[in-house]
A protein has these predicted regions:
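Active-site-adjacent loops and short helices of periplasmic peptidoglycan-processing enzymes
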Residues: 16-168, 172-181, 185-186
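N-terminal cationic amphipathic segment used for targeting or macromolecule association
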Residues: 7, 14-18, 31, 122, ...
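Generic "edge-of-domain/loop-turn" microfeature
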Residues: 7-8, 12, 40, 84, ...
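Sec-dependent N-terminal signal peptides of Gram-positive bacterial secreted proteins and lipoproteins
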Residues: 1-19, 443-453
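Domain-terminus/edge residues, biased toward the C-terminal soluble/receptor-binding domains
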Residues: 147-148, 162-164, 169, 174-444
Length: 453
């Protein structure tokens, strides 16, 4: 009986109720900005989110993320002459000189708090040998995170015509960075002691440029801000990325090309987000999907290959405070993005009207050891056609069909190619918002092999 009810719930679309209006009572003065739900990646509000600008030192968020994924904190970094002197004059520095050594940990604090450009170069050389080779890793990581409008040519963010980002891409990078515990700890730090080096034989204390975590800057300080990174060059103007959290609701914000309003714009975005939206745990409301892991197993296989169909109980969606979970609808997407969990067979997308508000993955796990396994052969046989009907759906856009991103000189803030500011834009087009019809062949096979545990 339970099986029948679950399959009916999956196969029969939910009744579409009149959804609550999406709030839009916010504006910013900077040329581009965004507030993104850090749990789901849903865009809450954006202005020119795919226009490209020079990022300045918020580039170091991506540099730090790559370092944290590839290095241990106690590794020793040696500062080369190129690392120390291949920077613009009077740019941010922690005072390291040629031949100095420091731990990866100290370099990261210098990078993210002091915004030390020589630390960015030294870390890049430590990993890749040269800053140019490290830039290759930066672009690969950005693409892995879903970035399509950006290109990186150095680890520090100094001016280069081939170094540019969009607000949306930078939000994806910042969201990923705040998912790293070490990154979150560093950018929340208000004071750190760097060990002695040649120019500072007694060591030095450093503090972040981000005023939103400093109580001695009352006009900018916010207790809900959990960290961030500032940037400035004469071309980029002021840039700022911030993470903030109240309860289970967590946002990241990005401001680009700001003429001094980066903090007031960020505060406006955060006030808008926390006053108008709430994070909702899927498992608290959607009993159809949240109980899959407890109630269903895929059988008809040898005992050693039995699988459990599960969904992450901690997955959240973001909703306006006036909206109810019952107003959301569900679609399944079988074109999984990079970084999908092992054993994932589909992404369950939650939408409010036409807007994606969150997602969770359906995954297959070993029923005994809870280790991820490959899909059962019966499902593999139907995957190529039944589970990936993208070629038959003219509404699905493909990254390979997209024109190359314009550089900073082609800032198309008002161009026709830009989506309306209130729409989630490309995120919905490429990844989550396409409502694919559930392939009947897939469910026929699943209905045969799924039994109540």
């Amino acid at each position: 009986m339970l099986l029948s009810l679950l399959l009916m719930a999956w196969l029969c679309p939910s009744t579409v109720l009149a959804s609550a209006d999406w709030p839009d009572n916010v504006s910013i003065e900077s040329d581009a900005g965004i507030i993104m739900d850090a749990n789901s990646g849903a865009v809450i509000y954006g202005k020119n989110i795919h226009a490209t600008y020079a990022p300045a030192s918020i580039t170091k968020v991506l540099t730090a993320l790559i370092v944290l994924e590839r290095c241990s904190m106690d590794e020793t970094v040696t500062f080369s002459q190129n690392a120390v002197y291949n920077v613009e004059s009077n740019s941010s520095s922690a005072g390291y000189d040629t031949g100095d050594t420091a731990s990866v940990k100290d370099c990261l604090y210098a990078l993210l708090l002091k915004s030390a450009n020589e630390a960015a170069n030294a870390l890049a050389e430590h990993i890749s040998g040269t800053t140019e080779e490290f830039a290759v890793l930066m672009n690969e990581k950005a693409a892995e995170l879903g970035c399509q409008d950006s290109h990186f040519s150095n680890p520090s963010g100094l001016n280069d015509e081939n170094h540019y980002v969009s607000a949306y891409d930078m939000a994806l990078i910042t969201k990923a960075a705040f998912e790293n515990e070490d990154f979150s700890k560093i950018v929340a730090t208000t004071y750190y002691e760097l060990p002695p080096n040649k120019k500072n034989p007694e060591g030095q204390g450093i503090s972040p440029g981000n005023k939103m975590i400093k109580k001695n800057w009352p006009d900018q300080y916010r207790p809900d801000v959990i960290g961030g990174k500032t940037g400035y060059t004469s071309i980029a103007l002021n840039t700022l990325v911030i993470g903030a959290q109240q309860g289970e609701t967590k946002f990241v914000t990005v401001i680009l090309h700001s003429s001094g309003t980066q903090y007031s714009d960020t505060k406006a975005l955060l006030n808008f987000g926390f006053n108008n939206f709430k994070a909702v745990r899927i498992a608290d409301y959607d009993k159809t999907f949240s109980t899959i892991g407890d109630d269903l197993k895929i059988s008809g296989l040898p005992t050693s290959e039995k699988q459990v169909l599960t969904i992450d109980p901690d997955s959240k969606i973001i909703l306006p405070v006036t909206a109810d979970f019952s107003e959301s609808t569900v679609s399944l997407d079988y074109a999984l993005p990079a970084g999908a969990p092992s054993g994932a067979i589909a992404c369950v997308n939650y939408l409010l009207g036409e807007r994606t508000v969150g997602h969770a993955y359906l995954t297959l796990k070993d029923a005994v050891s809870d280790a991820g396994l490959a899909l059962p052969q019966a499902l593999l046989e139907v995957q190529p056609s039944a589970l990936a009907p993208a070629a038959e759906n003219p509404d699905i856009s493909h990254p390979e069909d997209k024109e190359p991103a314009p550089g900073p000189s082609a800032r198309n803030a008002d161009g026709a190619a830009q989506p309306p500011e209130s729409e989630p834009s490309k995120q919905d087009g490429n990844k989550f918002s396409i409502s694919l019809k559930i392939p009947s062949l897939f469910w026929k096979i699943l209905a045969v092999v799924v039994v109540v545990a």
